[in-house]
């Protein structure tokens, strides 16, 4: 990835219109990589819009089905796919009610409190409440259960949120592992993310923090706070 400090609109930067690159936080780019070699495999990207991870999956050679329930957000994904010259099957649907699969791999970037984006949105702590986070955690648990349904036996499921709250990350996945015998953790190996091995937890999950990667030029440092767990369907 490349970082730059430039004035003006993103669309006016060199290479954007030609589809040479897309905008994505460094932390947000990690979950898709943890699916491994997905060339020729069927992959469902759930809650996909605006599509940075969909583009990653398509570029890696997967047969991607991108699902999101918001048509306007899917329109952005469609535009991004066209701009970079990649292809994916697009479905506007509620993941909880969507019938499809099973897939070789599933990526679920669940709706969350987005507290991990605090370095870019410093107002986040004043806009989120404990009750709101609890409600989101319930939604995430339902979406994760559905993602498990959509993963074939032997397939891989990556769950992630851009949240710093354990209720939307570590605690939620621990509860799912206790509750559902169909899944087991597939620990992330430090060698899979060379250079940022310190983000791998003792349990084999991934936890990035906004304070990581400091730089003398503040606009060039840091990354979003993300939680990522990799699971395997039995």
Residues of each region from the PLM?
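S-adenosylmethionine
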Residues: 1-234
